[in-house]
Swiss-Prot record:
Example GO BP: aspartyl-tRNA aminoacylation
Enzyme Commission designation: 6.1.1.12
HAMAP family: Asp_tRNA_synth_type1 (MF_00044)
Reactions mediated catalytically: tRNA(Asp) + L-aspartate + ATP = L-aspartyl-tRNA(Asp) + AMP + diphosphate
UniProt protein name: Aspartate--tRNA ligase
CDD domains from the UniProt entry: AspRS_core (cd00777), EcAspRS_like_N (cd04317)
MF terms (GO), sorted A to Z: aspartate-tRNA ligase activity; ATP binding; nucleic acid binding
Known role: Catalyzes the attachment of L-aspartate to tRNA(Asp) in a two-step reaction: L-aspartate is first activated by ATP to form Asp-AMP and then transferred to the acceptor end of tRNA(Asp).
SUPFAM superfamilies: Class II aaRS and biotin synthetases, GAD domain-like, Nucleic acid-binding proteins
Family: Belongs to the class-II aminoacyl-tRNA synthetase family. Type 1 subfamily.
Amino acid sequence: MRTEYCGQLRLSHVGQQVTLCGWVNRRRDLGSLIFIDMRDREGIVQVFFDPDRADALKLASELRNEFCIQVTGTVRARDEKNINRDMATGEIEVLASSLTIINRADVLPLDSNHVNTEEARLKYRYLDLRRPEMAQRLKTRAKITSLVRRFMDDHGFLDIETPMLTKATPEGARDYLVPSRVHKGKFYALPQSPQLFKQLLMMSGFDRYYQIVKCFRDEDLRADRQPEFTQIDVETSFMTAPQVREVMEALVRHLWLEVKGVDLGDFPVMTFAEAERRYGSDKPDLRNPMELTDVADLLKSVEFAVFAGPANDPKGRVAALRVPGGASLTRKQIDEYGNFVKIYGAKGLAYIKVNERAKGLEGINSPVAKFLNAEIIEAILDRTAAQDGDMIFFGADNKKIVADAMGALRLKVGKDLGLTDESKWAPLWVIDFPMFEDDGEGGLTAMHHPFTSPKDMTAAELKAAPENAVANAYDMVINGYEVGGGSVRIHNGDMQQTVFGILGINEEEQREKFGFLLDALKYGTPPHAGLAFGLDRLTMLLTGTDNIRDVIAFPKTTAAACLMTEAPSFANPTVLAELSIQVVKKAENN
């Protein structure tokens, strides 16, 4: 039906007769001439109809936006004054000799000339995806997956599929369950990840595995999460953590070079402890130059409980954040930041405005200065390298609240004041995470998952002091986004059962949920390690959007619903009966 794509026509096509298929993007009727911007997957080209082709001109008068059409015509060079440098096809146009209206379009529910609500865009997604910027994002996604496959193939990885219908295992989020008709009362679970299957593939001797795979997690959503998402899943045998990182870093550098033309260079490596201390986050955005500075040792003896309490508490922390040029912030802005940190559990936000250091106490403005002597204030200014015109914010509480609140404040202030260099790419590896964290109920939970190996600990040492265990785990972070994470896995049955025990999983439950894994660990399991990238998040970064729904063809809302298909929906009672399922409706409160 066509000879060329609209968006691929160039000066080299001048004089050629072409047949194009696509949609009317815009129409301009000048009476004796009609111009349309004709669009397809590859882009837009200008087509015009003149009086010498009367039949085509007459039919063109009926065209409206989003009509699906076929045009045959001759490619012509535009006059110099009419060249459109903003279009890839801007040096040429097509003089139409014939026009076929393949399908007409009703009045559109989306307006291409205005910003449409996200609800409307998702409801009429098939129209939203016609927009060039949306089409380009999905084309970039396709390019990324193609590049990944070629890279992994070139590095000896085998693309192996794993089951979608599997057994529920605790991986941190709720499972999506699928009832079995054959096995009454039993359910499959859709996989949160192929974690155990890819480990079993290493035990089977496949050495290097990868898969671009759908995963499912029934969890609360936010802008960068979906109930179903896509992973670039990787596992290797007989490779150390640094070796895995080296290959995966090479993959990501390859993607950025091919898609963006950017060489990311070598990724710095930072421990979890250092990231939390300096940036208040385990996924620091290194484009932001501000860092947290510990000042607790300077404040232990002050007569100000807000500072002295955390300063003398082993579980407490007092951290300062120097904001270059921040002394210009108004009282209203400071109050807004004070309310902002309360979201993260902070009780307030103390500060020192540094107007003129040479004047001592007279050169600063601070509601807490009366509690601090000149010597302590000077020591704080020295340690934070404060200069005239700077602002110093303080966080004082338990370590987690200080990290969360001050880390979030650092990001917000950096963006608000233009301190974060949005033009840069700042990748890094974060390693040496705590193996466990407090579950809030007196127990421990795995910080990553229960199959991660501890670093330099025996099973006995781990059992004796689990709170001191460091996980042999690593996350890749780019511009403050965790784009991938992985670890060295446990390949010893005793160690695996020890970890299960620490997590409160008794032997009976271990056999019930993980018996197949524990059995497999008895038969010469190789050391193995792996990683998974979030394809959606990688694509989001590479296409420059801050909404993950922009890089998924048919995404869900934050309520895990598809507005287009109206999924989820009620099931037919007959089908439910076949599955031995009865829906119990909660009584409404009167």
